[in-house]
Every structure is written in C-alpha cells, then in structure tokens.
C-alpha cells in the first residue's frame, strides 16, 4: 500500500498529502521518497502514487448493480442482485479494510443510486426483484451508520437513476419508472444535511443510466438511455447537464465519442478534470470551466468499465472486450495514464466507493454466463 509521511501540527500528527521540491526555480511534485536504513539501504518512506492494496474481506454474497458511496469514515455498498434475487444488504468498510454490517435497506433493491452530502449517505430508488418496477424509497445513513428514512423521491418511482454530490447536496437525476418500458424521467432531486428534499430543474432530456460525477462546484450528469432504440446509437444520449452548488442548471458540450454509445457510461475525476468513456479508449474530458476536450486515456477498448476517483486520480476498472478484463487504467491530475496492478478477479461493472485515500471495487459479474456474480473486493490506495 502507499507509504505516508506525517508532520506535527499543534501537537497532532497530520498526514502529508503532497510534497514538492524546487528544481530550476519551479516546484516539482515528489512522487516517492526514500530514507537510508542502518544497513545503508534505501527504504521507501513516502509514495504519492496510486497502488494496489490487495483485497478486503469479501461481500457476504456475490452481487452486481449495487450502489456505492461514503459517509464519515466508511465506504458503503448497498443492495444489488444475483441471478434470482435482489438484496437489502448494506456492508461498510473503513480505511483499515474492516468490514461492518450496517442496518439493511428498508427493502431489497438493485439498480439503485447512491450519493453523499457529507452528513449522510443516501441510497435512492431501485427495484425489489430482478424484473420489477422502480421504487421511490430513499434510505439515509449518518457517519455512525444509523439508518433514517428520508423523504421519498417526490415525483416518480425510479430505477437506473444517477447520483452524485454538489456542495451540501446529494443529487439524484433521471431514471425510469418501469422495468421493461420505454418511459424515461428527467426529474432531479436534491437532499441537504437536514434531509430536506428539494426539486431542482429537470434534465434537458429524460433518460436512465445517466452518469453523475462531482467536478469542483459542479455536478455533471452525462449520457444515458432515451428508451428509444430507433433514435440512433441504440437510444443512447450525449447530453451533459450541469448543476452548481446552488442547484442552478446549465449544460455543457455534448459527449463527442460516437463509438462509446453512452449507455453504461463510465465517469471519474482526475484533479480538475471530469472524464467520461465507454466502449472506447478515447475519453471526453471537461475542465473546471466545463470546456471539453478529447484524449486517448484508456489502454484497451472495453464495455462495462467502472470509473471512480481517489485522491487526484481517476481509476477505470474491469470490463469486457470481448473477454472479461482485470485491467485497471489510472489517470493522474495531468491526464497522464499510469499503469497499476489489475483486479484480482476479471469482471465487469464492479461497484466503487472511496473512503479517504482508499478506493474499493466490490462485486461485479460475468455477462458471458447467466448472472455469474462475484463477492470480491479489491483495494487501491492513493
């Protein structure tokens, strides 16, 4: 795992997050530090690079389509399904990889969404059975993992919705009310630290499978499924809706990579860049001013990749192309791709959650067999 240096401030030890050294009048970031031991050998004492940390205790059972987020000192994974059932299970991990069973959701749920506002982790919507319709329920967990029933999604039951944080809000967007129906939703709902529910301006187009990420003071909701397979790209949409910390709605330039489709879009943030991709090595990149560029950041084209953020890194894990992959692509804050150890088990669509400098990829499935689900939890540290 990553090595750390601590400095004393006010009689307390604080972890040093970044180190710089002056070279030619410029500050250069230190990636690794070594110290000489008594035998004269150089020992690594500090690393600012993302590293594979092995596996954490496995999930209680193999599942896919969980939702993951964090609150306080815990990364949380909730719900999900296997080949025959959906689950209400909630499992939490701290930065030491200790697993804790939290209070269950108020009902089984798969294809739900998760987001945190700093005070609570929220799990919203989903479906109770493998082919059932959407739910309106929202469960909130505080930093002690105490569960509270938050206000229901106010406009419609929903599954396959997107979630992320902006400012003091956990925000949920889009989705679909019925499992096998073409109707899609444009509703956007925000929850604050008092569990107050606020309806924000709707998405520009109703869609499910929208991908939400947080970029500074913005929440970006990108891509998704229109429900109309005859509308081009099998119904996928390239829209990018943006909400600021006051929930003011604007739009950014559309996604540009026609090969990526935009269904099951992956998204993550590296430093001051939001990165989106799927079915391609090319990525659409939005900076802090919401200006879009494109670049080749992934090592291999694959579908079902999970994107997540830890420290200043964007991490894209797993997928299938055409066989299941263990590949983990890492992009740093300068958009440089870094190689790292892959997943311990090849799979697509693991669920990600980050606590502090620790990123966990949990569960996932093998789409080449009938719902072959995994309970593996891989750990990366920044």
Model-derived regions, located:
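Kelch-like beta-propeller repeat domains
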Residues: 2-12, 22, 35-382
């Amino acid at each position: 795992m990553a090595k750390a240096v601590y400095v004393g401030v006010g009689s307390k030890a604080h972890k040093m997050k970044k180190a710089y050294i002056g070279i030619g009048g410029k500050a250069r970031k230190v990636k690794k530090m070594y110290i000489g031991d008594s035998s004269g050998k150089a020992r690594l004492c500090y690393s600012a690079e993302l590293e594979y940390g092995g596996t954490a205790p496995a999930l209680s059972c193999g599942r896919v389509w969980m939702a993951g987020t964090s609150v306080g000192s815990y990364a949380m994974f909730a719900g999900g399904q296997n080949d025959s059932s959906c689950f209400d299970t909630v499992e939490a991990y701290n930065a030491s990889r200790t697993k804790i069973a939290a209070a269950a959701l108020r009902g089984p749920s798969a294809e739900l969404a998760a987001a945190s506002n700093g005070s609570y982790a929220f799990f919203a919507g989903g479906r109770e059975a493998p082919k059932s319709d959407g739910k309106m329920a929202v469960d909130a967990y505080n930093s002690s993992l105490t569960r509270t029933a938050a206000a229901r999604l106010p406009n419609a039951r929903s599954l396959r919705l997107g979630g992320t944080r902006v400012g003091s809000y956990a925000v949920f967007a889009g989705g679909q009310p019925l499992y096998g129906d073409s109707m899609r939703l444009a509703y956007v709902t925000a929850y604050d630290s008092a569990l107050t529910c606020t309806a924000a301006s709707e998405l520009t187009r109703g869609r499910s499978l929208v991908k939400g990420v947080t970029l500074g003071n913005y929440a970006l909701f990108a891509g998704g499924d229109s429900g109309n397979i005859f509308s081009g790209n099998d119904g996928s949409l390239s829209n990018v809706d943006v909400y600021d910390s006051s929930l003011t709605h604007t739009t950014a330039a559309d996604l540009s990579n026609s090969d990526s489709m935009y269904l099951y879009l992956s998204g993550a943030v590296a430093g001051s860049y939001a990165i989106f991709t799927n079915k391609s090595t090319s990525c659409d990149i939005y900076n802090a001013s919401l200006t879009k560029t494109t670049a080749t950041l992934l090592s291999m084209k694959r579908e079902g990749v999970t994107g997540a953020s830890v420290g200043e890194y964007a991490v894209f894990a797993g997928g299938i192309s055409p066989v299941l992959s263990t590949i983990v692509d890492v992009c740093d804050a300068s958009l440089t791709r870094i190689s790292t150890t892959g997943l311990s088990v090849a799979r697509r669509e693991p669920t990600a959650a980050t606590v502090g400098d620790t990123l966990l990829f949990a569960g996932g499935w093998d789409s080449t067999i009938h719902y072959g689900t995994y309970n593996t939890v891989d750990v990366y540290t920044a």
